[in-house]
Amino acid sequence: MKKILVLFALLMTGVMGIHAQEGLKWGAMAGVNSSKFSTDGFDSKVGFHVGIKAEKDLPQIAQGVYLDMAALLSLKGTQINGNDASLKFNPYYLEIPIHMGYKYAINDNFAIFGNFGPYFAVGLFGKMKATGYLIDEVEGLTSIHDSAKVFGSNAMKRFDFGLGLKAGVEFFQKYQVSIGYDWGLLDNIEDSGNKNRNLMLSVGYFF
């Protein structure tokens, strides 16, 4: 955890340095995830994301066009719920989305925006947790609780890549509320066909 905090501090320092040099607009964002795997049989699971973000206007392309970037700690995963057992995947990622966007100002205090582009993610830590019951002829009903690391050779892959889409509103050029969706393009477990899917509701603040 200490290494992760140091990494986020370095990322924030880097963004602040770029901001000072090139006039980037930067701030913080956080929100709720609803994630699952792409194949049948998996249920959505609630998680979160939190981190820093930056926007860079690109007037050389067109007025209103901008580059949207972020560095987020994101809890994704999925769950399987049966009558007698359940299994939860709780992977934490360092996620870096890099999107091209367009922002249209209705007036000085209100704007709408949308952006689209790739994201890159590296698995940091997390657990797979299994709970359930076994029926034994002698002992009767036995409760089972077990967990294992979510990333590894027999578990989820650490690296993920995909595409994301986001739309939202901005108030007073400082506050944002947005909804987005990420489509993972890589199998998150070897040869499984499972890919990450994630619906996000976010709020942001620019310093």
Language model features with spans:
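Transmembrane beta-strands of outer-membrane beta-barrel pores
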Residues: V32-K36, K56, L73-G77, Y104, ...
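Sec-dependent N-terminal signal peptides
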Residues: I4-G14
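Short glycine/proline- and aromatic-enriched beta-strand/turn motifs that initiate or cap beta-hairpins
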Residues: A20-D57, A111, G132-L134, G204-F207
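Repeated loop/turn-to-beta-strand initiation elements of outer-membrane beta-barrel proteins
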Residues: P59-V65, F110, Q173-I179
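Outer-membrane beta-barrel "beta-signal"
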Residues: K195-F207
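Transmembrane beta-barrel domains of outer membrane proteins
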Residues: K53-D57, H99-K103, K166-E170, G204-F206
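Membrane-embedded beta-strand positions of outer-membrane beta-barrel proteins
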Residues: A28-A30, L67-A71, I98, G114-F116, ...
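Extracellular/periplasm-exposed beta-strand and loop segments of Gram-negative cell-envelope proteins
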Residues: F37-D43, K76-Y92, G123-D160, G164
